[in-house]
Regions:
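Active-site recognition of the HExxH zinc-binding catalytic motif
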Residues: 148-160
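Non-catalytic architectural context of zinc metalloproteases
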Residues: 2-47, 147, 256
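Metalloprotease/metallohydrolase-associated module, dominated by Zn2+-dependent proteases
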Residues: 10-11, 28, 46-144, 161-262
Length: 262
């Protein structure tokens, strides 16, 4: 029996009516998906203690490369390596708008000259205790969550290699479901802004922070990886409608103290 989320786009699998037309096994039984994902996770944790910690303490460049190599071998029979020649897997602390991103540049009419899967370090190192809901799957650990995000980017890579483009909604979901059991493309993880709001840090909040041996008081106007705080200052470059002047500071969230309303 076909699961309901998959049924909506099952007709799109007609473009691969015979599974043996693809250069890898498709679709995979759910038990096989779980087994292969567990093999990847076990191998990565065995070679990188920092990645195995909860929360994740660190991840080596070699671990990112090993992750791609294992997925290509276990799920794609080497197809990605053959199609692209090389895919760089990198970790970016500046990638905060998404948990991962697939990028490529073409050379000539069809051959792909360079491809990269950029994973968000900001996402990885904020994960703590599960369960986490990503792409329709519930996973227990930060490491599994990271793998599920990586699988999503791999689907972009394989769709692009097979069809010359990626992002065709129904086709992409068919691939993601058949390869990894994904039934959605969204996650329920809180954004930095939502996490900060739960601690009272949101635009309009009054805060204080230490600066050059003193304490400054201001108002939060934006929350991201850091907070933008406007501090009243007669010589400041910013002015409000009442004519008051301010200096703008970008402050790490952990350095801010929310001031209670009196």
């Amino acid at each position: 029996m076909i699961e309901a989320p998959f049924y909506l786009f099952h007709h799109e699998v007609l473009w691969m009516s015979a599974a043996n037309e693809l250069p890898f096994s498709f679709p995979l039984p759910n038990s096989e998906i779980l087994h292969r994902r567990a093999m990847v996770l076990s191998a990565l944790c065995a070679s990188d203690e920092g990645f195995c910690a909860v929360p994740v303490a660190s991840i080596r460049k070699q671990t990112l490369a090993q992750m791609l190599r294992l997925y290509d071998q276990l799920f794609f029979s080497g197809f990605l390596c053959h199609a692209y020649g090389r895919i760089d897997v990198t970790l970016s602390q500046r990638l905060t708008s998404s948990a991962g991103k697939f990028m490529y540049a073409r050379s000539g009419a069809s051959r792909l000259s360079h491809a990269e899967i950029r994973m968000s370090g900001d996402f990885l190192f904020r994960l703590n205790k599960g369960p986490f809901l990503l792409n329709g799957l519930s996973v227990a650990t930060p490491q599994e969550a990271f793998l599920v995000v990586f699988e999503h980017e791999l689907c972009h890579a394989v769709e692009n290699a097979l069809f010359g483009s990626t992002g065709q909604s129904s086709r992409f979901l068919s691939l993601a479901h058949g390869l990894f059991g994904h039934t959605d493309t969204r996650h329920s993880l809180p954004t930095r802004m939502q996490e900060a709001a739960s601690e009272g840090l949101s635009p309009g909040a009054k805060v204080c922070f230490c600066y050059q041996g003193g304490v400054l008081n201001g108002i939060v106007t934006y929350v991201g990886k850091t907070a933008t705080v406007m501090v009243e200052d007669r010589g400041g470059a910013y002015r409000d409608r009442q004519g008051r002047r301010y200096t703008k500071y970008r402050v790490p969230l952990e350095h801010l103290t929310v001031q209670s309303e009196k």
